[in-house]
Each structure stands twice: as C-alpha cells, then as structure tokens.
A protein has these predicted regions:
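A structural signal for beta-strand and strand-to-loop patches characteristic of beta-rich domains
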Residues: 1-224
C-alpha cells in the first residue's frame, strides 16, 4: 500500500500523558493528566484535547499466583473503542483527566483488560498532535482465583480425573495482587464438560458461550 508523504504530518507539540499510577488504571476511578507544549517549549494553552481508549481482553495474572485462574470463563469482551475524556488545556498546557466512562466495564469484562490510549491535542487550524500509551485496566477491586493441580492427556489437554480426590485452592486478591484481609464465604460449583468441549469452545467468544451453557449442568457444589 502506498502512502503520500505529504499526508503524514509530524507532531508540532510534545505531549506528556500520565494514566493511573503508571502501571494500572482503575476503571471505576479513572484519573490521569496530560501536558502539551509546542516544540519550541511554549505551553499549548487553551487547546482542545481528546482521549480515546481501545479496549481488549487479556488474561488476568498476578505474580506468585501463576497456577490460578482469575477470569470469568462465561464472559467474553471483544475489542472496543471509546472516547472517554474531552477537555481544554489551561494556561500551562495541562489538563487533569477524570471520567466514569470506564466504570461500566464492571460486570462486562471477564477480568483485566488492555487499554491502548490515544490522546489528540488540537491546534486552532484543526491539525493535531498525537500520543499513545498502553496500560492495563482493572474493572474490579477484588479478584477471586481458583487453583487446582490438573493432569495432561496425550494430546496436551488439561483434565481432572473424576475418580480421584482433588484439592481446590481459592485466593482473594486486590487489583495489585495483594491478598485481601478478612474472610468471605465462597460457594464453589464444579461442572463436568462433555468430550467435545474443545470443538464447541474453539474461539474466545465460543468458549464464553460454552461456559454459560455448562452452568446448567452442575456436577458438584462445595462450600468454602
């Protein structure tokens, strides 16, 4: 594909974008900041700024809990784009970012999400400078993890032998991966999948659909 060189405009502003704590974005309490300066150093004052987020599903993982699963298998989150903040920079070229546009992710996402954030700062002419940043988004404050030692078949599939006794480990962590204090009553339901589950769950979307249907075939319920 050919691209006309004159269609590509270099940034005329330097943009500094800070999201969350620099490592994790809290979807329910999104905060951040941006500062825009012209390349010669003058603040880009009174400039319109737009922040967009491209969201996609990722596996939820915490250091030290590699053998645990934290994602809701009955949920699927496809790639989605949202415009989350629109504002105007102050005299110093700065803009505080806050929004509740991501709070609706709670209950929709199976776990953590990846966010590709794109900020555009506009000139009076309509041209704009752009910057991007990728960050992990946490839609939840607390994550329950389930850990169980599985066996592998000759084809490499993991399974549990129903004729044997198994230990199921449960942990409750905050969004930073630290154990939550206190105690909670947990109801654990075990579902037995048929031998063709791998065919019915060949994609992330169909996996979620299969898991939802499996909720109607309870194999065993445990109290913890």
């Amino acid at each position: 594909k050919s691209v006309r060189v004159d269609a590509i405009k270099p940034n005329r502003m330097k943009i500094e974008l800070k999201l969350g704590d620099g490592q994790l974005v809290d979807a329910a309490h999104f905060t951040g900041s941006l500062t825009a300066r012209w390349l010669h150093g003058t603040p880009a004052a009174d400039a319109k700024a737009v922040l967009q987020a491209q969201l996609s599903q990722i596996a939820t993982r915490f250091k030290g809990y590699e053998g645990y699963s934290f994602d809701d298998a009955s949920k699927y989150f496809g790639t989605e784009e949202r415009e989350i903040v629109t504002g105007t920079t102050d005299a110093q070229g700065s803009l505080a970012l806050s929004t509740d546009e991501l709070s609706s992710l709670e209950g929709l996402s199976p776990g953590m999400l990846s966010g590709r954030f794109t900020v555009k700062v506009f000139e009076k002419s309509g041209d704009f400078s752009v910057d991007q940043q990728v960050a992990t988004i946490s839609p939840y404050d607390t994550y329950f993890g389930i850990g169980v030692a599985t066996q592998k078949s000759d084809w490499g599939d993991e399974y549990l032998d129903s004729r044997k006794e198994h230990i199921i480990k449960i942990v409750m962590l905050d969004s930073k991966g630290k154990p939550e204090p206190g105690s909670e009553n947990v109801l654990v339901s075990v579902y037995k999948m048929d031998s063709y589950w791998w065919w019915d769950a060949s994609t992330p979307n169909s996996q979620a659909h299969y898991a939802k249907n499996a909720l109607n075939s309870n194999y065993k319920t445990l109290q913890a």
